[in-house]
């Protein structure tokens, strides 16, 4: 089949299809003239004269494309009548909405408020006993919607208890979340959470609201409770500070008592002599010590007595009359370098509890070669100080001494 034959065949098919469509449209228009559609009004112009009278051009000239006849199809004609139909629906819908919004919602609210009123009047005596003490503290807006029935002036109105009993009875489940939140706001309770949480607060939340009020009223008589703990801690610290200040005024306690040669064994000896002078001042301070102050005291003892073990420091901490020299305030540097923390390096090994042995601290024999200054000299690259007289400790060292000059050079580096 050639290309010309295929194109000719397609033209014939198209012309036949057009002729069939035009014939159907003509027959439909003829039926509309004989039996007019009730939707079409009589004032519309006639559709028939717009069509040609003869059918010959539709049937016998299939190849010619005629202009589309000017007529309105039946599915387009109701558009002129659509405004009337839409007006009917527009008039009916607002009526339904108005009646629903104006009349329907007040019915369950009026019923739910009238029924608990009857229940409250039936319950009677338990109502005033529950709310008798709290009526004077209720806010005024809560009292306005409650009186629904007029009462004689001589009789006190029982309307507030039924209104509050309504919120404590069966009708709690019927209330919406917004109404529950509104009632919780009136009672001063939190309004966040699910409906079950709100119902639990409504059932058992009103009496706890009155419990913290006596605390607020009684709080001006005493100290306010948020500031009570810091004041107590400050007072305990002030009382605890009497002990180091009293120890600083003692003349018989020399700084040489800290040296490893004499060892910390002689340090408890002046304690019985000065014990009666310290008992009235350090007694309340030691009784009021907290965990934080105990830790600070242990750190201070570890800094002042590097040759003593941790067990000895903790045991001496229980005794409040143990004499200790005060912390030198002019010592160059922070105490974090000297504190026996496991994370610190270098200098922390000087004050660790594993270096001095308990035999060394209890006997006046010459000191162990692994002493604090030996470690410092080993770190700084100097010769060991095992031979020779025992030098004083870090806190009693003389800055002009040539043997301890390397120590201060080493300690100045981190700062």
UniProtKB/Swiss-Prot annotation:
Interacts with MEF2C. Coiled coil: none annotated. Residues 215-415 are annotated as: Transcription activation. InterPro entries: SAP_dom, SAP_dom_sf, TransReg_TumorExp. GO terms for cellular component: nucleus. Residues 28-56, 70-415 are annotated as: Disordered. The keyword Transcription regulation applies. Expressed in skeletal muscle, brain, placenta and spleen. The lineage of its organism: Eukaryota, Metazoa, Chordata, Craniata, Vertebrata. Pfam families: SAP (PF02037). Transmembrane segments: none annotated. This is MEF2-activating motif and SAP domain-containing transcriptional regulator. Residues 147-162, 263-273 have a biased composition (Pro residues). It is found in: Nucleus. Residues 41-53, 274-290, 343-365, 394-408 have a biased composition (Low complexity). Its main location: nucleus. Residues 78-94, 163-174, 198-219 have a biased composition (Basic and acidic residues). It comes from Homo sapiens (Human). GO terms for molecular function: transcription coregulator activity. GO terms for biological process: positive regulation of myotube differentiation; positive regulation of transcription by RNA polymerase II; regulation of transcription by RNA polymerase II. Keywords: Activator, Nucleus, Transcription, Transcription regulation. A motif (MEF2-binding) lies at residues 12-28. Residues 172-206 form the SAP domain. Signal peptide: none annotated. Transcriptional coactivator. Stimulates the transcriptional activity of MEF2C. Stimulates MYOD1 activity in part via MEF2, resulting in an enhancement of skeletal muscle differentiation. Residues 312-322 have a biased composition (Acidic residues). PANTHER family: LYSINE-RICH CEACAM1 CO-ISOLATED PROTEIN LYRIC PROTEIN, MEF2-ACTIVATING MOTIF AND SAP DOMAIN-CONTAINING TRANSCRIPTIONAL REGULATOR.
């Amino acid at each position: 089949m050639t290309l010309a034959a295929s194109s000719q065949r397609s033209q014939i098919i198209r012309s036949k299809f057009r002729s069939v469509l035009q014939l159907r449209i003509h027959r439909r228009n003829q039926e509309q003239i004989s039996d007019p559609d009730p939707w079409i009004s009589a004032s519309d112009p006639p559709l028939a004269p717009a069509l040609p009278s003869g059918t010959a051009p539709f049937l016998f000239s299939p190849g010619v494309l005629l202009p589309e006849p000017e007529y309105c199809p039946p599915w387009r004609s109701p558009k002129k009548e659509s405004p009337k139909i839409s007006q009917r629906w527009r008039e009916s819908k607002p009526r339904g909405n108005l009646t629903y919004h104006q009349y329907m919602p007040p019915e369950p609210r009026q019923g739910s408020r009238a029924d608990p009123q009857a229940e409250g009047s039936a319950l009677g005596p338990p109502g005033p006993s529950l709310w008798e003490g709290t009526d004077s503290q209720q806010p005024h807006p809560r009292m306005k919607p409650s009186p629904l029935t007029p009462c004689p002036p001589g009789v006190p109105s029982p309307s507030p208890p039924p209104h509050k009993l309504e919120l404590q009875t069966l009708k709690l489940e019927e209330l919406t979340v917004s109404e529950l939140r509104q009632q919780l706001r009136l009672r001063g309770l939190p309004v966040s959470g699910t409906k079950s949480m709100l119902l639990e607060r409504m059932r058992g939340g009103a009496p706890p609201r009155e419990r913290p009020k006596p605390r607020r009223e009684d709080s001006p008589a005493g100290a306010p409770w948020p500031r009570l703990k810091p004041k107590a801690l400050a007072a305990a610290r002030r009382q605890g500070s009497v002990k180091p200040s009293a120890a600083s005024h003692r003349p018989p306690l020399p700084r040489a008592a800290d040296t490893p040669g004499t060892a910390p064994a002689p340090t408890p000896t002046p304690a019985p002599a000065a014990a009666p002078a310290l008992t009235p001042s350090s007694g309340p301070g030691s009784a009021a010590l907290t965990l934080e102050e105990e830790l600070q005291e242990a750190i201070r003892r570890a800094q002042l007595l590097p040759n003593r073990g941790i067990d000895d420091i903790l045991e001496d901490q229980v005794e409040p009359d143990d004499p200790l020299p005060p912390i030198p305030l002019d010592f160059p540097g922070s105490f974090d370098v000297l504190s026996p923390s496991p994370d610190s390096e270098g200098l922390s090994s000087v004050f660790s509890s594993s270096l001095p042995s308990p035999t060394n601290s209890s006997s006046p024999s010459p000191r162990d070669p692994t002493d604090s200054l030996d470690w410092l000299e080993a770190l700084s690259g100097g010769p060991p100080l095992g031979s020779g007289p025992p030098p004083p400790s870090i806190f009693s060292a003389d800055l002009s001494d040539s043997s301890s000059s390397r120590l201060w050079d080493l300690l100045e580096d981190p700062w």
